[in-house]
UniProtKB/Swiss-Prot annotation:
It is an enzyme of class 2 (transferase). It is found in: Cytoplasm. Keywords: Amino-acid biosynthesis, Arginine biosynthesis, ATP-binding, Cytoplasm, Kinase, Nucleotide-binding, Transferase. The gene is argB. It comes from Hydrogenovibrio crunogenus (strain DSM 25203 / XCL-2) (Thiomicrospira crunogena). The record marks K33, K255 as: Transition state stabilizer. Catalyzes the ATP-dependent phosphorylation of N-acetyl-L-glutamate. GO terms for molecular function: acetylglutamate kinase activity; ATP binding. The keyword Amino-acid biosynthesis applies. Substrate binds at G68, G69, R90, N195. This is Acetylglutamate kinase.
Length: 298
């Protein structure tokens, strides 16, 4: 097929724009949290896999951490078990934890690995149990009890938080040119499994690997101001002000906090990007404009 002059110039322009980013990030680790619409729509799923394979091909080291909340909810519904949430966290009893582990570590994780393989990448699927990757501890949550007029401890069951990341297995895979794909299931010293928020796991993995970037895919354009306009660049000081004035609230609050914690602990930059845009990861990494909100420490 022959390209006309305009098409040829457009392709050349795109490649020229990508070149400095390829040079800058070659050899660097980029942690990508994969979730939301990007996990359910076929075009977005294939676009994501191609983006990850391209990053690896040009010398970057992508590490994928994935969620799977809707898939967990669907299977729980099929087995007749109702989902319960407290402050956005899924209450996870032992039976639910078995299903969470099966869905995240089995179905979802292996689907992503297979998708990357279909686009000629080399991926290895892991949970936090593999290589003692994610050492977890039970999450403690409190809520104010009006009857007691005091804070009350809430038992979420097998919901955990990251205590530490063991990077040995990740370092080995990266050195051997594999793409790690991580399911956010952790384990404590007694061998108990925990369901952990995928954003939190991605942030801690990025910190432990001293990643260049942490990228969190969402179902929004990024962080929006009170007028609904995209905020493209923020630092720690401006994030604090936006939390104070109520611009950042609800479900976006823990995501932003995770991104902020990462840049304050050695990650160069965090990005909240629109996973509903096809090839969102590629556009954020390889173009001047990007497709979301950039967060830095200063």
């Amino acid at each position: 097929m022959n390209l006309n002059k305009a098409q040829a110039q457009n392709i050349a322009s795109v490649l020229a724009e990508a070149l400095p980013y390829i040079q800058r990030f070659s050899g660097k680790t980029i942690v990508v949290k994969y979730g939301g619409n990007a996990m359910t729509e076929e075009a977005l799923k294939n676009g994501f896999a191609r983006d990850i394979v391209l990053m690896k091909l040009v010398g970057m080291n992508p590490v994928v951490v994935h969620g799977g909340g809707p898939q967990i909810g669907h299977l729980l519904e099929r087995v007749g078990k109702q989902s319960e949430f407290i402050q956005g966290m899924r209450v996870t009893d032992s039976e639910t934890m078995d299903i969470v582990e099966m869905v995240l570590g089995g179905m979802v994780n292996k689907e992503i690995v297979n998708l990357i393989h279909q686009h000629n990448g080399n991926a290895v699927g892991l949970t936090g149990k593999d290589g003692n990757l994610i050492r977890a501890k039970k999450m403690e949550m409190t809520a104010f009890n009006e009857d007691l007029n005091a804070p009350e401890l809430i038992d979420l069951g097998h919901v955990g938080e990251v205590e530490r990341i063991n990077t040995k297995v990740l370092d080995m895979l990266i050195q051997d040119d594999f793409i790690p794909v991580i399911a956010p299931v952790g384990v404590d010293e007694q061998g108990h499994s925990y369901n952990i928020n995928a954003d939190l796991v991605a942030g801690k993995v990025a910190e432990a690997l001293h990643a260049e970037k942490l990228m969190l895919l969402t179902n929004t354009p990024g962080l929006l101001d009170k007028q609904g306009e995209l905020l493209t660049g923020l630092n720690a000081e401006s994030v604090a002000a936006l939390i104070e004035d109520g611009t950042i609230y609800g479900g976006m609050l823990p995501k932003i906090q995770c991104a902020l914690d990462a840049v304050q602990n050695g990650v160069e930059s965090s990005h909240i990007i629109d996973g509903r845009v096809e090839h969102a990861v590629m556009l954020e990494v390889f173009t001047d404009e990007g497709v979301g909100t950039l967060i830095t420490s200063h």
